């Protein structure tokens, strides 16, 4: 084996070791021993109750108890930070724990920035939906379709806030499943917009197909071990199909509908915002990570497409309200 090949292998192994250190904090013996000793010393047999001698040490707030921080959870949280500091002392990269970066807990919330931004997204969608209902007649084209997307979004943001508050298997499932429902609904709205002149029967069949697919996918996520990689691929593929569909639509109507530029702008900005999800860095001040920034970026995007709805209404082009529901 040549020295160049050997050097390449050494560099590759070094990169792999670094990657492991950066993502496997919960697999270190240090973390494992710390957690074992903590639970044996401070917790009840089931790991739920804090022993009397440790109550003053943990000093749980009303929010910690409300969000069900058990003694075992407190041990995991404390040992997580002890492990992080141990990595710091050795000059190693900040590790992840169970696939997540370490976050400072605030008022019982595991990821406070993502919770706040999810709630802000919910508030913005709710406020703009109410404004839409005041200004658009119920018999307007795509009135119901816009409501379907809005309600789907509101539900998704509720579960996003709940999941980032406390990460349980159930809250994780509902967050991922309902987040995908928003993306799938975007694709559904695009298809319905393309077929708005076709028969009600055809649109009904397609609606049932979308519903059946989503129920089946929800059931798939609910059974067995959660497949994060597959779920991400499905989300990206669905989003790309919806975006491509709108780009094709914009291309064909560019001479007849000048507002198509707003739709293009929305999807370009959405793509830029989604690129934040590709970044992966330790939380700034242990609170703000790339995922939280993605949630922050979607707040003005919601206002952007509802703003376009208002402009179209003032122009008496009611039929395109549904376009902005994606």
Swiss-Prot record:
InterPro entries, per the entry: Per1-like
Cytoplasmic side: 127-142, 193-203, 254-267, 326
Residues annotated as glycosylated: 42
Function: Involved in the lipid remodeling steps of GPI-anchor maturation.
Family statement: Belongs to the PGAP3 family.
UniProt cross-references to PANTHER family, sorted A to Z: PER1-RELATED (PTHR13148), POST-GPI ATTACHMENT TO PROTEINS FACTOR 3 (PTHR13148:SF0)
Protein name as catalogued: Post-GPI attachment to proteins factor 3
Highest classification ranks of the organism: Eukaryota, Metazoa, Ecdysozoa, Arthropoda, Hexapoda
